């Protein structure tokens, strides 16, 4: 079972060209499901039924995952099983017919212009990294990029 997991992650990296963060998220989700299956115990991807999937949803709910996280788990596992079907490892995808409503969309939190200006002005510039930090905050504000995107920038 671990072999198929590794093949899928390699497929995401090489053929789908997913980012390392996305691949890591898929890995985490599939590993969580694998850990659950070993406790049940289920010893083959082919043994998983729609009933097992529904029970797993209950487990995720009891572990206090929120709706959007559970939807992400389902999406990851649906994609993984699609891969397994395409490769002939399993005959059917038990996740294909299972749906789960996402939670309400949250509006993103944001700063007003005057709040950002106060924050940038609070970086006094007396310490060696202040200039860099000020520039980073200004780049974040001006472009709207995520912190994860900013950390991946190279000069």
Residue ranges and their predicted role:
Residues 1-155:
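Conserved catalytic core of the tyrosine transesterase superfamily
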């Amino acid at each position: 079972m671990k072999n198929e997991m590794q093949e899928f992650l390699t497929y995401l990296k090489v053929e789908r060209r997913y980012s390392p963060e996305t691949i890591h998220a898929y890995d985490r989700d599939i590993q969580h499901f694998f850990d659950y299956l070993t406790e049940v115990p289920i010893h083959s991807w082919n043994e998983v039924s729609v009933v097992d999937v529904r029970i797993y949803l209950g487990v995720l709910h009891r572990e206090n995952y929120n709706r959007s996280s559970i939807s992400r788990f389902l999406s990851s596992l649906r994609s993984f099983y699609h891969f397994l079907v395409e490769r002939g490892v399993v005959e059917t995808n038990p996740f294909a017919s299972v749906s789960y409503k996402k939670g309400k969309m949250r509006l993103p939190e944001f700063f007003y212009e005057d709040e950002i200006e106060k924050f940038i002005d609070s970086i006094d510039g007396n310490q060696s990294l202040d200039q860099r930090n000020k520039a980073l905050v200004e780049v974040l504000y001006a472009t709207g990029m995520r912190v994860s995107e900013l950390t991946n920038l190279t000069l």
